[in-house]
Amino acid sequence: MSKRTLLTYFSSSGSSTPLETNDNTRQPKMPRVEFRCSDIISDPGLRKPIDDYLSEIRDQVKRAYVLRGPTQQALGFTYPRKWQSGEWRSFQHHWFEKYDWLEYSEAKDAAFFFYCYLFFHPGKPEKFSSNVFANIGYEQWKKALEKFDKHAASQSHCNSRLNCDDFMNQRTSVA
């Protein structure tokens, strides 16, 4: 009886057939998702919702917007006037002083809330027009301050602001 060594247990014998590999069962490589800061759209009325970005780059997108800050026109910009409730009305530049997170879209002639754009979750029940201030835009200037104040006091807005503060304060690396 011949002694077998450890290697003989693992060496291939010519009688076995090689395992077949099927190229169709291999998973295709997913293209690498990249985000460039140049992809940032400054006008809030033209932006796509944050949740429409791939989850792999969503934080990068949020960080780029946070670094850029809210879109606020320079003093002297002429806001278009609309006939509303029997008067000519328009967005007022001094509202930026009271609401530092307020944004204005030239494309839609509408107001947006920066924190709500970044951290609004559309799956949650909508109260106080959260989606309007995050993605659609508010354009009823007669009651704008009343609506801004009501929304700013809402849990949705407060949570968005806290989430933004937490997001800005998180460490980018553990070292």
Describe each region flagged by the PLM.
Residues 1-175:
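N-terminal leader/early-domain signal
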